[in-house]
């Protein structure tokens, strides 16, 4: 009998309001399971970014409960938040690169903060910049990079430390279709080879169709539309994404 997988994230009747305004998120109940690939969709203003803010611990809900990695996020002391955030990789819409650091040093930041040996940092960052076609821009400061280049640096930084949960807000919005597909394949490699749970917010229907075994979470006016059992219970069959598959190369080697 297959052991029921643990839960990465569990929302229980979560609501969120800003100030005295009406709720921007209402009655959200769902579970994210290890090693799954999720797309978050919905019209502009549906609440996608607000939901992502809850996921990457930038916001606490107005009501309801959230558990992450087995801990209650509502009662978690703020002093413990940094340790939890180290388990996350986040791609923001506005990139949030460190202005005075080069592209290389921005990507290296999570590894250095984790205390990785500099030789390993150099190898990992060089490989990652090569994957996102930015080796030639390694020494460039963010202000000299195009929007698409900044986005690729932000994505490389988010995945470099092999997070347990990757959260990406419109990660392909500033790149051409060829690079968008390549970045999606990078997320899939992280998902397949490392076992990272991936949540991608996007309007791009074609992008969603390229990950056939993904699960779709659709928001409408702050509520989860058409919720399925897959968002509440683990899949009946293993998705083929093993959290123990860390021996495989990441990022994957380039094909000739």
Residue ranges and their predicted role:
Residues 166-169:
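Catalytic Walker B motif of ABC-type/P-loop ATPase nucleotide-binding domains
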Residues 64-72:
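Conserved ABC transporter NBD signature motif
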Residues 56:
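Helix-to-loop junction immediately C-terminal to a conserved catalytic motif
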Residues 101-109:
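Short coil-to-helix segment of the ABC ATPase nucleotide-binding domain corresponding to the Q-loop/switch region
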Residues 141-145, 149:
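Conserved ABC ATPase signature
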Residues 162:
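Conserved catalytic motifs of ABC-family nucleotide-binding domains
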Residues 73-89:
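ABC ATPase NBD coupling module
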């Amino acid at each position: 009998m297959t052991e029921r997988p643990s839960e990465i994230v569990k929302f229980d009747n979560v609501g969120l309001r800003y100030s005295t305004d009406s709720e921007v998120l209402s009655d959200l109940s769902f579970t994210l399971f290890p090693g799954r690939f999720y797309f978050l969709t919905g019209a502009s203003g549906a609440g996608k970014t607000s939901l992502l803010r809850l996921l990457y611990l930038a916001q606490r809900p107005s009501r309801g409960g959230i558990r992450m990695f087995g801990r209650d996020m509502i009662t978690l002391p703020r002093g413990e938040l940094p340790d939890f955030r180290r388990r996350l990789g986040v791609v923001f819409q506005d990139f949030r690169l460190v202005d005075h650091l080069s592209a290389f040093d921005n990507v290296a930041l999570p590894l250095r903060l984790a205390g990785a040996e500099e030789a390993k940092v150099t190898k990992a960052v060089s490989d990652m910049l090569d994957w996102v076609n930015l080796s030639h821009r390694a020494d460039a400061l963010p202000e000299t990079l195009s929007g698409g280049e900044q986005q690729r640096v932000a994505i490389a930084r988010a995945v470099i430390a092999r997070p347990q949960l990757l959260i990406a807000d419109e990660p392909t919005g500033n790149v051409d279709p060829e690079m968008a597909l390549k970045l999606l394949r990078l997320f899939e490699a992280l998902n397949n080879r490392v076992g990272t749970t991936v949540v991608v917010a996007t309007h791009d229907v074609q992008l969603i169709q390229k990950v056939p075994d993904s699960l779709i979470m659709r928001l409408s006016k702050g509520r989860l539309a058409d919720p399925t059992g897959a968002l509440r219970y683990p899949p009946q069959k293993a998705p083929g994404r093993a959290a123990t598959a860390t021996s495989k190369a990441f990022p994957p080697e380039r094909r000739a």
